[in-house]
Amino acid sequence: MVSPKDGKRYPTDVASTEVLLRIIQSVPSPKAEPFKLWLAQVGRERIEETIDPELTIERALETYLKKGYTREWINQRLQAIQVRKELTDEWQDRGVEKGLEYAILTDEITRAWSGMSTRQYKRLKGLKKENLRDNMSTTEIILNMLAETSAKDISKKEKPEGFEENRKVARRGGNVASIARQALEAETGDSVITSQNAVQLNRVVTQAIEAISKSDEN
């Protein structure tokens, strides 16, 4: 790490999230107790979700509501999660490796339908570690779902073998959504791709609700 005082580099201790949580668990200080209780709660909830998967959906719904998302958006997002799961299951059946290969295929799909790589898309929305899908508009989510479910359906039909064949299928799935995007943009005259992120999108929704409420009052 570079010191702001003399500009020299010095070794710095760093820890992953897992290591950091283990450190917190080992701290004897009473000040660490709230964190330990929180970790215990999260662990209990994770075990409950393993026993009853429906709890995962219910808690995801609650989390999105607390963040200010509309129910319409949440319904689309939860459906998108299911579509994504079906796609990754298909990739697994086709021998695609989790991690890097999943990321590359996802990038191919995103680039094919949106015209941007995942990194470029996140940069457009001012995102860093945040989930791109959590910062999409409803229309963006729907088109991304169309791209992913198209890739899954083509894969099930053609049963591609090897990474490169799956890569071609991913592009074709993305192209299906690209055609839909271009058709919609031709009808509306507006770009489907927006630079707005979750905070900005929620603000727009809030302002619209307030405007409707004032109109009803008048």
Predicted regions and their residues:
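Positively charged, phosphate-engaging catalytic surfaces used for nucleic-acid and nucleotide handling
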Residues: 5, 15, 19, 25-218
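Basic, Lys/Arg-rich DNA-contacting stretches centered on the C-terminal catalytic core
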Residues: 1-10
